[in-house]
Structure formats: C-alpha cells, structure tokens
C-alpha cells in the first residue's frame, strides 16, 4: 500500500512527496519529520501508534490507514498531553464507495429488523473482522439503537476487499455491497484525508466521513 500512496502523492499537483520512511530503506520516521506537514501511515498497529505519537509531538498531522488500529491509546495520550499540536485521522477504509456503503447501511438499519455483515479479504489480511466491518456494525448499532449485527469473515487468495450488508424484514431483504477490485480505489480518499486533516476541529477522529460529508 505504501508504494501506491507514494505514487498517488507524486501525481497530485498540490502535494510533494518529501520522504519515504521505511526501516528497510534505512530511513527512520523521526529523521524526516521536520520536512513533512502530513504523514500517511499504513504500517502495523503497534508501529502506527508510536509513529502517530511521534508525529503529534512534532506538530505533524497524521493520516492512518493501518488495519486493526485502536485509537483509544492515542486519544488517551492526547488527552493527557492537553495540547492540540497536530491532528490525526484514522480511516478503516479510504474507498469512497465503502464509506457510502457504511452510511447507507446505517440508514437502512433504522428501518429493517435484522442484519448481518459478510466481509471478504485476501488471505494476507492480518485482522478479522476487518476494520471496515467493525465500523459498519458500530454505525448501524448507533443508528438503530440496537446491538451491532453479526460479522462473518472470509479470507481467501484472489480476493482484495469486499463487503456485503444483508438486512432482512417481513417478506423482504436488502443487500448493500461494495467491492474493491484494486488498491488504487483507496487513493482518492487518502489524498482527500491528507488535504483535510489539518482543518479538523477535533482529533483524533475515526472515519473518512469526517472529511467527506
């Protein structure tokens, strides 16, 4: 994902790629923070937390797409610090269609009796259920006032990222599905987050919808 993000940033007229932080390249994040206004992180959850804290202390905004990232420790650290030095946006999914799917599912959950979520990903994905599915279930529960719907996870070679929300009521069902065919589908959302993270009124926030709607 990092290579795809770098390519997208380089192609954007209003952005400049100033560094690629990667231990395999011998480049540590702390060594390049002075050059950056925004850092995009697609690492592992434990690494992403340390990276985000380092960025915030340096006054650098952060966009996090790391799968399975828990924002609670970051929020606690920010609250303890007491200063709003930089903003953090965490997105379970950067695909615009996926964000719309979650929004539609939350709206439908207000009107349909029951629902279940099926999420399918490549067999190299580390977390199950996916962050997108967990976020969808949470939004649906908040909208309906009920409990989060069950989530079924599938991990198989040949898949990229897919999710279907199936809602049922008396004599009818409703299916809302999103399919990611290529990782390039995430890039418009990543670039949007990079452009908007600095103007967030609260931080950290979870969900691309915070800058999309």
Regions found by a protein language model. Give the residues of each.
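Conserved NAD(P)H cofactor-binding loop of Rossmann-fold oxidoreductase domains
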Residues: 43
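Rossmann-fold NAD(P)-binding glycine/threonine-rich loop
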Residues: 46-53, 57-58, 65-90, 96-99, ...
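An anion/phosphate-binding loop that grips the pyrophosphate of nucleotide cofactors and donors
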Residues: 36
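N-terminal Rossmann-like NAD(P) cofactor-binding module of classical short-chain dehydrogenase/reductase
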Residues: 39-40
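Short glycine- and Lys/Arg-enriched binding-loop motifs that mark or flank ligand-binding interfaces
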Residues: 61, 93, 127
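C-terminal substrate-binding/catalytic lobe of Rossmann-fold NAD(P)-dependent oxidoreductases
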Residues: 2-33, 46, 112-213
